[in-house]
Amino acid sequence: MTEAGLDAAARSLRAWLNRQQFSDLSASEVTAFFTDAVADWATDQGYEVQREVTLPTATRQNRTGRLDLQLRHRSGKGRLISIEVDRGTKEWSLDKLVQAAELGHLALWLRWSRAPVTLPIPPTVRLIRAQVLRRTTLARAKLHSLRPDNCG
């Protein structure tokens, strides 16, 4: 698949995520929600989903990485899709996706936060931003919510 395939995958996942919503989840619950939502999207698109997949080679920093999700189409056709789901702007996550793209995978980075992304995103990776709202309760718990149409 060409770069158009990468754009198509990103558009499709964004559209799926824009139909999702949740309220009052903890940070770990939000990450689990998005990981499960991506897995549901992938299954709906005909992909087999693997979680926590080790990259076959070390990154430039000589670290072996694990991708949050890796998708393989059930037909056996097309390229693998590698996905990272993060709240923060982790250079390590981006490095893993760059390596996956160098291996020929489509690379998607789902980042959930309202804070801006401060790293330059290479042309081989597509960033999907989920605009998650955060509030602090009287007990100082930080709870997160997502409304429909807040993923771009």
PLM segments and residue spans:
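Helix-adjacent hinge/juxtasegments
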Residues: 50, 55-72
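A short acidic, amphipathic alpha-helical/loop segment
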Residues: 93-100
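Conserved catalytic cores of phosphodiester-cleaving nucleases, focusing on short active-site segments
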Residues: 67-87
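Hydrophobic beta-strand segments of well-ordered beta-sheets in folded domains
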Residues: 80-82, 104-111
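Short glycine/proline-enriched coil/turn segments at helix->beta-strand junctions
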Residues: 45-46, 101-106
